[in-house]
Amino acid sequence: MSHGRMNLALSLVFILCGLFNSIFCEKQQHSQKHMNLVLLKKISALSQKMEAHPKDFAQELFKALIIEDPRKNIIFSPMAMTTTLATLSLGIKSTMRTHHPEDLKLEPKLLDVHKYLQPLVHVGRELVKQKVLKHQHILFINRKMMVNQMLLQQISKLQGMDIQMIDFTDIEKAKKTISHHVAEKTHTKITNLITDLNPETILCLVNHIFFKGILKRAFQPKLTQKEVFFVNDQTKVQVDMMRKTERMLYSRSEELHATMVKMPCKGNVSLTLMLPDAGQFDTDLKKMTAKRAKLQKISDFRLVRLILPKLKISFKINFKHLLPKIDPKHILTATAISQAITSKAPLPNLEALHQAEIELSEHALTVDTAIHTDNLLKVPVKAKEVPAVVKVPMKAKEVPAVVKVPMNTKEVPVVVKVPMNTKEVPVVVKVNRPFLLFVEDEKTQRDLFVGKVLNPQVE
């Protein structure tokens, strides 16, 4: 068996542009203050709840998505959504000039929302240190607005945010300015970002993250072949099935009717595949969090022959339509805003879409995520080749063997320790029916991505 190295490129780019119709005439300043207050309270309340119970949020979101699109593939980033909403609430707060912090029912000294971001900020900083993550917040604010400069300085310091004042009334100039600034900050990885813009925009938040990971060993291209994937009892499709054999975390439960494998990546990140038994997929979705936790508890390192389909799927989430189905009490809706505003005034418009795409092949797993008003950005990112050392747990009687893998002259040889016990029979995990996938940060056990693959042939 050859021991190649698999480049796992998880390129994550998520962008949010919050577009709000604002009122600037003297008679309506009081109404605008109340609208911003409602926006801040509701968005920050939701982001705090998402941060406090991340896996519960992911499961609730899954349930809502399944109800809305039961026969579709799903991929999304719970962490991206949490960070986006929390950061957006900071931007809204910066546009409020009040001499009574107690009116906000938030910590008057600093940013109450910020403490809920700390675990995510810490995750980001650690991955940046390991050179597998790059990220930045860019906040564009209408220069005609009166803003809280002290608060903006705090946001810039704590979040490392780049703050730009801009004139949104000249739409074409504003679009070019934003797109050019973002392209410059991302080294032209993101170009022509803004295609549509409202002249009454007060805030435009851009949050971009590029994440790269490396799996220890690649699938073997020469072993890929066509096989049947059972979408359901009535539907089956022919797909390219990849293969590789290696030691990985494995768990199997007859009681839970599910199998799970977990593969480590560089940067304390892992890729987990959860395969429900035939006929148990819908049940597993309803109890996803509990079953996953139980399977992890009983997992151990085993020699596994993994057979997995090549796939490319994408999915779009509309914040405005979906989030009220998860928690109507804390979601920003037109009804909720109108009830909180005493005087008649146009309602602020909040549009945000979350669209993600995932592609899995023999040599790379690429995840692109974009949060934007109306467009999906596809940013191909090549992962740097990093020498890998694969340590495989062995039995007492096994003798380690050193396998030298041919590489470029400038690269350091890869040392792979493999078991020499030829009598060991690998456990076969054949993913030929709907399954779940998770890309997780190991230190915090936070999900960077969550996905449901129903049909690998359908994008």
UniProtKB/Swiss-Prot annotation:
InterPro entries linked to this entry: Serpin_CS, Serpin_dom, Serpin_fam, Serpin_sf, Serpin_sf_1, Serpin_sf_2
Listed A to Z, the keywords are: Glycoprotein, Pregnancy, Protease inhibitor, Serine protease inhibitor, Signal
- One Pfam entry for this protein is Serpin
SUPFAM superfamilies, alphabetically?
Answer: Serpins (SSF56574)
Q: Name one GO cellular component term.
A: extracellular space
- GO annotation (BP), single: female pregnancy
The glycosylation sites annotated in the UniProt record are N268
On whether Signal is a keyword of this UniProt record, the answer is yes
| Positions of the record's site feature: Reactive bond | M420, N421
State one molecular function term (GO). serine-type endopeptidase inhibitor activity
User: What start and end residues bound the annotated signal peptide?
Assistant: 1-25
Q: Which family does it belong to?
A: Belongs to the serpin family. UTMP subfamily.
Protein name according to UniProt = Uterine milk protein
